[in-house]
Amino acid sequence: MSDPCGKKLVQEISPTMSLWGLEDRHSCQGQPQPDQDPVAKEASASELQMKVDFFRKLGYSSSEIHSALQKLGVQADTNTVLGELVKHGSATERECQASTDPCPQPPLVPRGGSTPKPSTVEPSLPEEDKESSDLRPVVIDGSNVAMSHGNKEVFSCRGILLAVNWFLERGHTDITVFVPSWRKEQPRPDVPITDQHILRELEKKKILVFTPSRRVGGKRVVCYDDRFIVKLAYESDGVVVSNDTYRDLQGERQEWKRFIEERLLMYSFVNDKFMPPDDPLGRHGPSLDNFLRKKPLPSEHRKQPCPYGRKCTYGIKCRFFHPERPSRPQRSVADELRANALLSPPRTPVKDKSSQRPSPASQPNSMSLEAEPGSPDGKKLGTRSSPGPHQEGSTQTCAPAGRSLPVSGGSFGPTEWLPHTLDSLPYTSQECLDSGIGSLESQMSELWGLRGGSPGESGPTRGPYTGYQTYGSKLPAAPAFSPFRQAIGTGHFSVPTDYVPPPPTYPAREYWSEPYPLPPPTPVLQEPQRPRPRASGDPWGRVSDLAKERAGVYTKLCGVFPPHLVEAVMGRFPQLLDPQQLAAEILSYKSQHLSE
C-alpha cells in the first residue's frame, strides 16, 4: 500500500499504529521523495513505538496520543508531544466537569412495594469550621485591655486590636469586645485615647460593640459595661478576657460568681505582645488550649521532670518525674522492712538474757566424739578442757540443733557440717548488726574466732557456715577454738586422738560491744617443738585460707544485703567465693521469694 507521494505507510510495518496516519503530512508537499531504506523504516517504527508506550505509561489514552501525533507530526520530539497531551488532557477534564449529570440516579426500591425513606446526608463541615465550632466564644473587656496596654495612663486601642488578632489566629470566630460609647467621642486632655480609628474598624467588622450612654442635664449617664460583659459570656458559655475580678457582680448572683471563678482569662502585655497564661486556673488546672475549648482534649498526665535529675536526694518522696527510675511503684522503707520480714525464716522464741548467758562455772567446756562401731580401735575420741570463762553462747556448738557430729575413723568432711535445708540455716541477730559494719566485724569475730592456738602456732579459722545454735542449747559445748570446729574446707583430714587444744586467746565478754581485753600470757613450753614445714597439700592450710576468704566475703556481703539472705545463698553455694556472683544469686533468690 502506497500513499500519493509514493511512500509506504509505517502502519504496514507496525500494525499497532494503525489507529493513526503516521505519515508526515509536511513531507508529502512538494516533490516526491525516494523510498527510504527498509532498515531505516524499521528503526523509525521502533522509535515511534517506544514513544507511544512511554505516553501510555503516563496514563494517556490511545485517542489522545492519536490526536496529538496528527497535529504535531511523527517527527515531533517527546517534550512537544507531551505538552500537547497535557493541554488536551486539561481541556478534556474541564469538559467532563462541565458536563456532569445534574440529576441523581433513582434509588433502588426493594421488593415488597414499600417506598424507601429518602436518605438524608448531613453536610460535612470543613475542618476549619469544625475547629472553630469547638472553641468557646470570647468576650473581651475592651476598657480593661486598652488601659492595660496604655500602662494605666492612656486608653490604647491598639491593645484591643492585639488581643482580637491573637484569638483570630487561634481560629476563634465568635469574638465580642465591649467598649463604652463615650470612648468614640473627641478625646479630652484628661482622658487621652490613642489609635481611635481602630474602634470604628472593629465596629464595622461586627467585633466591637459600644455600650449605651447618654447625657442628661449636661451630665453623661453611662451604663455599666461590666454587666454586659459577664452576662453575655455567661449566656453564651464563653470566656471573659479581663484582669478585673468583678467582685461587685460576683455578689449579685451566685451562678455569676462561680462562672467568673472558672471562666476568667487574665493576660499580660509584653513588648506589644498579648500573652495569656498557659495555666489560667493555676498549676493544677487545665491548659490554655483546653480552657478555650468546649470539649477539652485528653492530656497526658505526666509529671514535670525533676530539676535535680540523678542528683535528687528526695527519693520516693520527690513529686517530680525521674526517667532514670523504674516505672514500678515505689515502696516506702516500712514496706521494704515488711517484705524482708516475710523472707526471713521463723525464729524460735528467745529466753531471758540470764538463760542466754550462763555463768562460766556452770558451762561445761567439753566435747566428746564417739567413733563409729566399725572403727578398728572402738575407742572414744574425746577432748576435755577445764572450764573457763572464754566461751559465749553464740560460739558453743559446731553443728545445728538436732544434728550430731559425724565421725568416720577420725576423718571429718566439711560438706557434712553444712545445713541442707533453708529452715535450719542460722542467722545473725539483727540487733547486733544495726550499729554498722564495725559491729558486724566484732560479731563475726566473736562467732568464729580470728585465730586459734598460741602466738607461735597459727591455727585455721572456722568458717561462718559450719552452723551454730542459739543461746540455751542443750548440746555439749566445744572449745571456741578447737580444731574440730575449725574443720571446714575441701577434702577430709584427720585429727590425732591425743591432741589437746591450746588455751583460748581471748577471755569471755559479757556484751558484744565490749572491747577485747589483753590476752593472757602464754606459758612457755619446756620442750619447744620444731616448726614443721607445711606441705603444699596440707589440708590445714587450705582450710585456713578458705575459711578466711569465706569470712571476708560474708562480711562484705552482710554490709549490703540482710544476713539471713547471705547465709541462705552461701549455704546453697558452699564452694562459690566470688562476691559478684554471690550478689547476683542473692538478688535472684530475693526476687523468687518476693514473687512467692
Curated annotation (Swiss-Prot):
<keyword id="KW-0217">Developmental protein</keyword>
<keyword id="KW-0832">Ubl conjugation</keyword>
<dbReference type="GO" id="GO:1903936">
    <property type="term" value="P:cellular response to sodium arsenite"/>
</dbReference>
<dbReference type="GO" id="GO:0032689">
    <property type="term" value="P:negative regulation of type II interferon production"/>
</dbReference>
<dbReference type="GO" id="GO:0032691">
    <property type="term" value="P:negative regulation of interleukin-1 beta production"/>
</dbReference>
<dbReference type="GO" id="GO:0051259">
    <property type="term" value="P:protein complex oligomerization"/>
</dbReference>
<feature type="binding site">
    <location>
        <position position="226"/>
    </location>
    <ligand>
        <name>Mg(2+)</name>
    </ligand>
</feature>
<dbReference type="GO" id="GO:0035925">
    <property type="term" value="F:mRNA 3'-UTR AU-rich region binding"/>
</dbReference>
<feature type="zinc finger region" description="C3H1-type">
    <location>
        <begin position="301"/>
        <end position="324"/>
    </location>
</feature>
<dbReference type="GO" id="GO:0045019">
    <property type="term" value="P:negative regulation of nitric oxide biosynthetic process"/>
</dbReference>
<dbReference type="GO" id="GO:1900745">
    <property type="term" value="P:positive regulation of p38MAPK cascade"/>
</dbReference>
<dbReference type="GO" id="GO:1903003">
    <property type="term" value="P:positive regulation of protein deubiquitination"/>
</dbReference>
<comment type="subunit">
    <text>Oligomer. Found in a deubiquitination complex with TANK, USP10 and ZC3H12A; this complex inhibits genotoxic stress- or interleukin-1-beta-mediated NF-kappaB activation by promoting IKBKG or TRAF6 deubiquitination. Interacts with IKBKG; this interaction increases in response to DNA damage. Interacts with TANK; this interaction increases in response to DNA damage and serves as a bridge to anchor both TANK and USP10 into a deubiquitinating complex. Interacts with TRAF6; this interaction increases in response to DNA damage and is stimulated by TANK.</text>
</comment>
<dbReference type="GO" id="GO:1901223">
    <property type="term" value="P:negative regulation of non-canonical NF-kappaB signal transduction"/>
</dbReference>
<dbReference type="GO" id="GO:0010884">
    <property type="term" value="P:positive regulation of lipid storage"/>
</dbReference>
<dbReference type="GO" id="GO:0004521">
    <property type="term" value="F:RNA endonuclease activity"/>
</dbReference>
<dbReference type="GO" id="GO:0005737">
    <property type="term" value="C:cytoplasm"/>
</dbReference>
<dbReference type="GO" id="GO:0008270">
    <property type="term" value="F:zinc ion binding"/>
</dbReference>
<dbReference type="GO" id="GO:0006915">
    <property type="term" value="P:apoptotic process"/>
</dbReference>
<dbReference type="GO" id="GO:0004518">
    <property type="term" value="F:nuclease activity"/>
</dbReference>
<keyword id="KW-0524">Neurogenesis</keyword>
<keyword id="KW-0238">DNA-binding</keyword>
<dbReference type="GO" id="GO:0043124">
    <property type="term" value="P:negative regulation of canonical NF-kappaB signal transduction"/>
</dbReference>
<dbReference type="GO" id="GO:0043022">
    <property type="term" value="F:ribosome binding"/>
</dbReference>
<feature type="modified residue" description="Phosphoserine">
    <location>
        <position position="344"/>
    </location>
</feature>
<keyword id="KW-0597">Phosphoprotein</keyword>
<feature type="region of interest" description="Disordered">
    <location>
        <begin position="278"/>
        <end position="306"/>
    </location>
</feature>
<feature type="domain" description="RNase NYN">
    <location>
        <begin position="135"/>
        <end position="290"/>
    </location>
</feature>
<dbReference type="GO" id="GO:0003723">
    <property type="term" value="F:RNA binding"/>
</dbReference>
<dbReference type="GO" id="GO:0002230">
    <property type="term" value="P:positive regulation of defense response to virus by host"/>
</dbReference>
<dbReference type="GO" id="GO:0071356">
    <property type="term" value="P:cellular response to tumor necrosis factor"/>
</dbReference>
<dbReference type="GO" id="GO:0007399">
    <property type="term" value="P:nervous system development"/>
</dbReference>
<keyword id="KW-0378">Hydrolase</keyword>
<dbReference type="GO" id="GO:0006974">
    <property type="term" value="P:DNA damage response"/>
</dbReference>
<dbReference type="GO" id="GO:0032715">
    <property type="term" value="P:negative regulation of interleukin-6 production"/>
</dbReference>
<dbReference type="InterPro" id="IPR021869">
    <property type="entry name" value="RNase_Zc3h12_NYN"/>
</dbReference>
<dbReference type="GO" id="GO:0006954">
    <property type="term" value="P:inflammatory response"/>
</dbReference>
<dbReference type="GO" id="GO:0035198">
    <property type="term" value="F:miRNA binding"/>
</dbReference>
<dbReference type="GO" id="GO:1900119">
    <property type="term" value="P:positive regulation of execution phase of apoptosis"/>
</dbReference>
<feature type="region of interest" description="Disordered">
    <location>
        <begin position="24"/>
        <end position="44"/>
    </location>
</feature>
<dbReference type="GO" id="GO:0010468">
    <property type="term" value="P:regulation of gene expression"/>
</dbReference>
<dbReference type="Pfam" id="PF11977">
    <property type="entry name" value="RNase_Zc3h12a"/>
</dbReference>
